[in-house]
């Protein structure tokens, strides 16, 4: 570059690489001919870059540049990251290290986090939040401090008149927050002085100031170029100004719009430059969400006019068409200027090579993006970059690419909490926090890394036995209920007790953590448990190494600060901390595919760039106000508004749009429902106008849908299985007859196929569990009355609940209502003239060669000698109408068994049939419990027809199904109130809508 080659000069040397040129490649293309000629050439050059990722991107650009020209070796420039806390050492001889000795070290971020939590607790006193909430507040406080420190705002600035004048107009909570923040900051500064340390942001500022003074006094003998640095922090802006004025220095900016009209440039707002001394540097109307705003802010703080910035004329290998930059400029016009779209000429809105793809779901979007990547790789040498801030979408794309053995690493990484090693430690913390709750416990023991020193298959075999036993309502906390479950199943599984000893040895320390103990000690217990389960595999991969660094640092820091936690908060605290740690993949992915986050995508370029996840709340992310300082306070202090980051996201998209080929994609729905298109995507669509159809990508969507769409198939018929006579030869229970007649398929699935529904782990206690428990209590109470007629039912209820390992919360909610209902039953039984003959009585009979059996909850002897059959219900009993319709035949079948002498302990004719409900009742003295009979009611069967009708229905079931050949058709009677247990098995949703009325009848 001729301009860059000049020595000296009266003005700053600032350049801009247009979006369509590709920053890193264009930068290298311009630097190489200027600096490689004499001596060590490029090795004499120092590049100041914004991030470690940018350093890697530029290094790759150098390698591509020389590789394309067949040159084997090169000495690359020294590259220093401006945010490096050891910038003085990175610059080496260019910056006298001795001169930086007076700059204190930076405080460790984790130590600052825990120390701020302690200060907040002391400042807030009784109002201080507890546990994880306090630590979250400390993290937010640290972020706000960093935001102010980057702007060189010190605690004393919070007490200046420009801020104090605003306090009276603020809401009460903002006032309290400001006072607390100011006090904590002041105490924190005092603490740092005692430690002879500074915040990381302060150290960076001091290093920038030191370098600025050193180079302003004596410029380095070798060239220094700041490339891609766009941070507008005042100290860094001053350093960049100094670099631009050095004889061999220059500043190169990405994507500064030099063609923008001055009127539009002015419409962006003040951007840090107050029109008068007392005015705020940021106005309410500033277009902080514009992609050029942060660059205007930087130029203003550097003291460089936009007219002084020169265009960089070199271009990279993956440069886009020049007219693309004009379209990008028009695309992001501020609100007033966007009226010009109506009169824009074609060359100003030309977006050739840009396509828009709108999928239905994130899954379809990921599949379509993977197909676009796969297609692009068919062309030799073509590079593809997928840019998205949605890490879940990125993981889906990575998984889909594995279909073709394309290994694409997500360079943005994953949070440590979402990796295998991190998740294992978190699950151990959840077990400690929840007292070995079944969901957390089974998840921990089933973790892919867990084996407990055994063969993994043997480990899982025993675990499945325990997991099946834990299905149902949550037991009470602790290991004792689990040990009782293991003991109860030891006879059927001899290896289970030995396996449980291993597990118990791991879990016992987790559940023995003190109520309020040291965080360091708790982490040590968690690590020991995780190692006992996973062994060395816990630390073997990159996530394990990251976890090792994390736990060691947190443990040491927590011990130094004396941080204490409750076990119940342990998992929340660790998850919050691990979410801040990114685990990036090692090298080894496909050389021509990259998946970036927004930060990682800066300065990178590819032949095809796919911008995915373009929905509001994703790209751009939702703008959130500072939780501690009110927006007017931040404006008065000279801090950009909350939407500033939206402008950075817009700049990232503008940079990506400069690629030769660009695909912008979104999903119409996400996991929560309909999604709103990104404001950036809506601008692209509006700019294209009538040309939008020409820029729509549909091929990839068609391919993606073709991969998931199955070939058309015939409508699934209504199931009507016809088992053999041998398979049909099953008994009929009293509760199954109505299912056999109303929905034969359910009977077939349950009695012939022997399929039973599995309860979920920690399932909410439902009617089935409540019924079993209530029946067990009543059975024991009746049995106790045989020896003690005055036996109380409450102690029996307590004992049954203890044996059932019922969770304390469940007991607290249900026991009072249950006890009231049970007391009603006890009172009714004591006051009755009946004699209780049998409880939970099993009976059976042979009916036309088929065994019919049932269990009567209670059988009473009536004063006249007949029998009363009682059925307990925890909820509302079947109505007389349902009984008459044949939808509730249990009492009738039990009556037939009793009539034929099927109950050995209760001979006699059945005369009464009753439901005793434990549900709420206004007529009960206790508020719960009532009895009713379906027989003899106006809408129910008469006493004379009840048993004969039941017998006829039983004979029909035996004749047609058990002894006959009638198919077990699904939903034979559509009015039958069937359970949904087997709906999926019968594929109900596939055939029910098309079932014709004749078939129904």
Protein language model regions, located:
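Polyanion-engaging groove/track-forming segments
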Residues: 1-788, 798, 803-804, 811, ...
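RecB-family 4Fe-4S metal-dependent nuclease core
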Residues: 524, 538, 672, 713-1001
């Amino acid at each position: 570059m001729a301009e860059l080659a000049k020595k000296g000069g009266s003005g700053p040397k600032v350049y801009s690489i247009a979006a369509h040129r590709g920053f890193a490649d264009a930068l290298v293309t311009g630097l190489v001919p200027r600096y490689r000629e004499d001596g060590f050439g490029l090795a004499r050059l120092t590049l100041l870059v914004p991030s470690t990722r940018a350093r890697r991107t530029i290094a790759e650009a150098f390698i591509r540049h020389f590789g394309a020209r067949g040159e084997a070796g090169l000495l690359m420039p020294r590259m220093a990251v401006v945010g490096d806390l050891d910038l003085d050492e990175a610059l080496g001889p260019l910056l006298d290290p001795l001169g930086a000795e007076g700059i204190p070290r930076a405080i460790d971020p984790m130590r600052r986090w825990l120390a701020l939590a302690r200060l907040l607790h002391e400042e807030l006193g009784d109002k201080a939040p507890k546990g994880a909430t306090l630590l979250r507040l400390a993290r937010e406080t640290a972020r706000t401090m960093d935001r102010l420190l980057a702007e060189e705002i010190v605690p004393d600035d919070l007490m200046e008149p420009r801020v104090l004048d605003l306090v009276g107009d603020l809401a009460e909570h903002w006032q309290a927050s400001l006072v607390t923040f100011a006090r904590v900051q002041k105490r924190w500064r005092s603490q740092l002085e005692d430690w002879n340390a500074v915040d990381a942001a302060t150290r960076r500022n001091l290093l920038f100031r030191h370098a600025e003074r050193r180079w302003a006094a004596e410029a380095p003998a070798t060239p220094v170029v700041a490339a891609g640095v766009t941070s507008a922090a005042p100290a860094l802006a001053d350093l960049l100004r100094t670099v631009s004025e050095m004889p061999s220095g220059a500043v190169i900016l990405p994507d500064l719009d030099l063609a923008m009209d001055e009127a539009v440039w002015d419409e962006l707002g003040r951007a840090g430059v107050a029109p008068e001394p007392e005015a705020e540097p940021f106005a309410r109307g500033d277009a902080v969400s514009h992609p050029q705003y942060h660059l205007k802010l930087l130029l203003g703080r550097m003291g460089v006019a936009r007219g002084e910035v020169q265009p960089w004329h070199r271009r990279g290998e993956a440069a886009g068409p020049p007219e693309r930059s004009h379209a990008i400029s028009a695309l992001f016009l501020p609100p007033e200027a966007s009226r010009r779209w109506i009169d824009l000429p074609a060359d100003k809105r030309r977006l050739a090579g840009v396509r828009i793809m709108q999928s239905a779901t994130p899954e379809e979007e990921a599949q379509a993006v993977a197909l676009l990547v796969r297609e692009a790789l068919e062309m030799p040498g073509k590079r593809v970059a997928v840019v998205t801030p949605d890490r879940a979408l990125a993981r889906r794309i990575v998984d889909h690419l594995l279909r073709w053995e394309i290994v694409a690493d997500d360079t943005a990484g994953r949070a440590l909490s979402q990796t295998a090693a991190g998740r294992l430690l978190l699950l151990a913390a959840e077990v400690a926090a929840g007292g070995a709750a079944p969901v957390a416990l089974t998840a921990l023991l089933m973790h892919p890394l867990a084996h407990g020193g055994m063969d993994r298959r043997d480990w899982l075999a025993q675990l499945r036995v325990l997991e099946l036993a834990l299905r149902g309502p949550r037991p009470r906390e602790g290991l004792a209920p689990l040990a009782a479950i293991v003991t109860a199943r030891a006879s059927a599984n001899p290896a289970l007790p030995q396996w449980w000893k291993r597990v118990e040895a791991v879990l016992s320390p987790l559940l023995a953590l003190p109520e309020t103990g040291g965080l360091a000690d708790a982490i040590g217990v968690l690590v020991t448990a995780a190692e006992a389960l996973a062994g060395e595999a816990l630390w073997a991969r990159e996530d394990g190494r990251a976890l090792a660094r994390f736990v060691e640092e947190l443990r040491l820091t927590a011990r130094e600060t004396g941080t204490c936690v409750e076990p119940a908060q342990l998992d929340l605290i660790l998850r919050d901390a691990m979410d801040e740690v990114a685990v990036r993949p090692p090298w080894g992915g496909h050389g021509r595919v990259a998946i970036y986050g927004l930060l990682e995508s800066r300065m990178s370029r590819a032949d095809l760039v796919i911008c995915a996840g373009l929905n509001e709340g994703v790209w751009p992310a939702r703008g959130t106000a500072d939780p501690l300082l009110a927006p007017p306070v931040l404006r008065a202090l000279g801090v950009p508004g909350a939407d500033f980051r939206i402008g950075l996201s817009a700049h990232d998209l503008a940079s990506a749009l400069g690629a030769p080929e660009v695909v912008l994609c979104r999903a119409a729905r996400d996991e929560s429902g309909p999604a709103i298109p990104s404001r950036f995507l809506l601008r692209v669509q509006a700019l294209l106008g009538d040309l939008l159809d020409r820029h729509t990508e549909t091929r990839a969507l068609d391919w993606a849908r073709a991969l998931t769409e199955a070939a058309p198939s015939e409508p699934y018929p209504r199931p009507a299985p016809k088992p053999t006579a041998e398979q049909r030869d099953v008994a009929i229970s009293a509760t199954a007859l109505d299912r056999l007649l109303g929905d034969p398929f359910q009977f077939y699935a349950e009695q012939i196929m022997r399929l039973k529904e599995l309860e979920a782990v920690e399932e909410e206690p439902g009617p089935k569990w409540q019924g079993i428990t209530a029946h067990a209590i009543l059975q024991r109470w009746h049995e106790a009355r045989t020896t003690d007629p005055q036996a109380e039912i409450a102690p029996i209820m307590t004992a049954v609940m203890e044996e059932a390992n019922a969770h304390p919360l469940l007991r607290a909610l249900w026991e009072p209502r249950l006890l009231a209902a049970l007391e009603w039953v006890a009172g009714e039984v004591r006051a009755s003239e009946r004699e209780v003959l049998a409880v939970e009585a099993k009976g059976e009979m042979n009916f036309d060669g088929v065994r019919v059996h049932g269990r009567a909850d209670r059988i009473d002897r009536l004063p006249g000698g007949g029998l009363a059959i009682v059925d307990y219900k925890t909820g509302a009993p079947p109505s007389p109408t349902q009984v008459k319709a044949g939808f509730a035949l249990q009492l009738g079948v039990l009556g037939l068994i009793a009539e034929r002498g099927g109950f050995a302990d209760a001979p006699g004719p059945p005369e009464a049939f009753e439901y005793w409900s434990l549900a709420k009742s206004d007529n009960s003295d206790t508020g719960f419990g009532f009895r009713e009979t379906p027989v003899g009611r106006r809408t129910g069967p008469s006493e004379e027809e009840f048993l004969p009708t039941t017998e006829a229905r039983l004979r029909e079931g035996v004749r047609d199904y058990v002894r006959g050949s009638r198919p077990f058709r699904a939903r034979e009677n559509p009015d039958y109130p069937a359970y949904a247990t087997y709906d999926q098995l019968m594929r109900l949703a596939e055939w029910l809508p098309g079932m014709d009325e004749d078939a129904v009848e």
